[in-house]
């Protein structure tokens, strides 16, 4: 893939799973702010401080990349790395994508789609759940240690 410029518009790390149980009960509150200006990535483990970090069942899907296609607060989609100007959903399974926001490249192997859940119709306008089918992002495994920051990013 030829290098292209895009933007990291949001980075999210949450120590808890906010969308558990029935949507009618409302999301679980976050114990600390989840929006970050930078994140630490660890190869094979995920994002430091995130609920999926170093969980054996989630190592191949520890980080979720998402295209900023939903109007409103990208935090509500609960995806880790939100990109503008790059079609994350076009990445095929098994591909490797590198992101470099200024601290050196961090590679991710794409494993599977991040399917939306019914919570999307609770935290976004009704119909978002259906609209995000096939556009919910990609679950990835980090292949390198590194740092990613909000702002311009080279993708290759």
Question: Which role fits each region the language model picked out?
Answer:
Residues 1-107, 112-113:
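Electropositive, beta-rich accessory/interaction domains or terminal extensions
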Residues 66, 90-91, 126, 133-135, ...:
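Short alpha-helical interface elements
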Residues 71-79, 122-136:
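Short, basic/aromatic beta-hairpin or loop at an interaction surface
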Residues 82-85, 137-149:
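Short alpha-helix capping/helix-loop boundary micro-motifs
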Residues 94, 105, 145-153:
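Loop/turn positions that initiate beta-strands
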Residues 99, 110, 150, 155-156:
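A generic structural signal for residues embedded in beta-strands
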Residues 107-112, 128-143:
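Active-site scaffold segments
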Residues 116-117:
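Short, surface-exposed beta-strand-loop junctions and turns on beta-sheet-rich folds
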């Amino acid at each position: 893939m030829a290098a292209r410029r895009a933007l990291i518009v949001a980075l999210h790390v949450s120590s808890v799973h906010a969308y558990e149980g029935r949507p009618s009960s409302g999301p679980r509150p976050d114990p600390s702010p989840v929006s970050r200006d930078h994140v630490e990535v660890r190869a094979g483990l995920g994002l430091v401080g995130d609920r999926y970090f170093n969980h054996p069942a989630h190592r191949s899907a520890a980080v979720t990349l998402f295209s900023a296609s939903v109007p409103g607060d990208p935090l509500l989609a609960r995806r880790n790395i939100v990109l503008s100007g790059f079609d994350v959903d076009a990445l095929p399974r098994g591909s490797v994508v590198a992101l470099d926001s200024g601290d050196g490249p961090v590679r991710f192997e794409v494993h599977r789609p991040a399917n939306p859940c019914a919570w999307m119709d609770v935290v976004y306008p009704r119909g978002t759940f259906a609209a995000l089918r096939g556009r919910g992002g990609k679950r990835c495994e980090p292949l390198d240690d590194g740092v990613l920051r909000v702002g311009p990013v080279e993708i290759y």
